[in-house]
Amino acid sequence: MAKEPTKAAHPQPEQTKTNHKAHRPVGGYVLAKDPIEINQGRPRTTLTVRNTGDRPIQIGSHFHFFEVNRYLEFDRSKAFGLRLDIPANTAVRFEPGDEKEVTLVPFAGKRFIFGFNNLVDGWSGDGPTPDYQPNREIAAERAEKLGFKSCKSGGKDAK
């Protein structure tokens, strides 16, 4: 049998007493006193969106709105290069037949968009298109060909 370790062989570190009080528990949050404004200074676009399908559709905060589910009907051309103006890791849900107004903001950074429904797979910025595909017109043609619903609407720029 092994011997029990003795306290002399394994001394405990000396505890020091302080008057220091923790400002927050370990792992606690540090919150700003002022409200946080997301996407500050970015231009906003408001669109009316309708779910024409028979199932609920949920769109996450950073999904390229131009490429959302084909059964959502809205002016897709106005949503090119934009995403929902909601906090990260949140979503907007459209029940069948629902019609809602959503506010969109441009993607930040270099505005390269890949994946989603593969309608864009490239640059989504404004201005002259770089030397590679796609551009807004090609993406719109691809969406129409694949049956993504769209309608011309009175989408507006929000302040």
UniProtKB/Swiss-Prot annotation:
Cellular component terms, GO, for this chain's entry? Answer: urease complex
Write the protein's name: Urease subunit beta 2
- Annotated region (Disordered) at 1-24
Pfam families membership: Urease_beta (PF00699)
Function, as annotated, reads:
Disrupting the ure2 operon has no effect on urease activity, or pathogen survival in BALB/c mice when inoculated by gavage, but confers slightly enhanced resistance to low pH killing in vitro.
Query: Which top-level enzyme class is recorded in the Swiss-Prot or TrEMBL entry?
Result: hydrolase
Pathway, per Swiss-Prot/TrEMBL? Nitrogen metabolism; urea degradation; CO(2) and NH(3) from urea (urease route): step 1/1
E.C. number: 3.5.1.5
